Every structure is written in C-alpha cells, then in structure tokens.
Regions:
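Residues immediately within or flanking Cys/His clusters that coordinate Zn2+
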Residues: 4-7, 28
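Extreme N-terminal regulatory/targeting segments of RNA polymerase sigma factors
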Residues: 2-5, 42
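Disulfide-bonded cysteines in secreted/extracellular proteins and peptides
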Residues: 7-10, 34
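Long, charged low-complexity interaction segments
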Residues: 24, 28-82, 146-157
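Canonical RING-type zinc finger of E3 ubiquitin-protein ligases
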Residues: 15-24
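Cys/His-rich microdomains that often coordinate metals
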Residues: 13-15, 38
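The conserved phosphate-sensing helix
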Residues: 85
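Short, cationic/aromatic linear interface patches
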Residues: 89-146
Length: 157
C-alpha cells in the first residue's frame, strides 16, 4: 500500500515506502537529503549566532548580551530578513574597517540597518575581486613602470 506523504522542506509528495525518509515529528516527514540539508543549515546558523554574540560582547565590553541587543538582533532577523553573519559583518565593517567609535552606540547595535547595505557591497566587491583573481599567479605579476620627467623651473632674472 502506498504511503504518500509531503516533505516539509521541499514540499514534494513522495511515497515513504519507496524513498528513504526521516520522521521529523508525528505525521510529518521529510526526504533524508532535505533533512540533512536543513540540519546543516541550522548548525551553521547556530554557529553564526554564537560568533555574533561573542563579537558583540567583545565590541561593547559587556559580560553578556543585554536584552536590548537581543531584541535588536531578533528585529533585524524577523523584519529585515538579515542573517546573523550579515549583522556581524556589518558591525565589523562599521567599527573596524570604517574606524568608528563605540561610544555613540549607547550599549546597542542600532547602526546595523544603516550600514548593512554598504557592508554587503564592500564584502561583495572583495568576493568578486577574489573570484576574478583566483586563477592568477601573484608571483608572476610585474607592474608597469612609468617614468615621469619633470623639468626644473626656469629662474626669472
């Protein structure tokens, strides 16, 4: 007898007698591949969250994440669809690369929505340059030498 079920991740219908599956919860099934992809995505997201929290603790000089910062992070994740790694990179961009001070932060990370797009463009341009120069050998690169001659000024007598 066929047991048709729907994968909760990819939403495709499959027969659980013919394909390997994982029972995610009672009466909820998923392909084995879909479940493993989702599990690895969740592990990566958790690692990104831990890295963000450690960076914020170091940045603001606190011993823990304050409720204000936690609420800001949750707002950015839910309303703006930012990622944990994106928020961390935006903070790194604003405070370390741009060299801004944390004194005006007032114990929060409210600057993130204002610098997120700039940080994204900055890191995207770095990624693009790495992709473009991936197959180039830096040792063989010889810069072109340009000789500029400047005539000495003439004295007016």
């Amino acid at each position: 007898m066929a047991h048709k079920v729907k994968c909760i991740y990819c939403h495709q219908t499959f027969d659980r007698d013919k394909y390997s599956f994982v029972q995610v919860s009672p009466r909820r099934y998923a392909h084995t591949e879909c479940a493993s992809k989702e599990q690895s995505r969740l592990k990566q997201e958790e690692a990104d969250k831990i890295a963000l929290e450690e960076y914020i603790i170091k940045l603001l000089g606190d011993d823990f994440i304050t409720p204000r910062v936690r609420k800001q992070i949750n707002t950015y994740i839910e309303q703006y669809q930012y990622t944990y790694s994106g928020i961390r990179k935006a903070l790194v961009y604003f405070y370390e690369i741009k060299g801004n001070s944390t004194e005006k932060a007032n114990g929060g990370i409210g600057i993130v929505p204002y610098v997120y797009k700039d940080a994204f463009n900055y890191y995207y341009s770095i990624w693009e340059a790495n992709q473009k120069n991936q197959n180039k050998d830096v040792q063989k690169f010889v810069s072109k030498e340009k000789v500029i001659k400047i005539e000495p000024p003439k004295r007016n007598l």
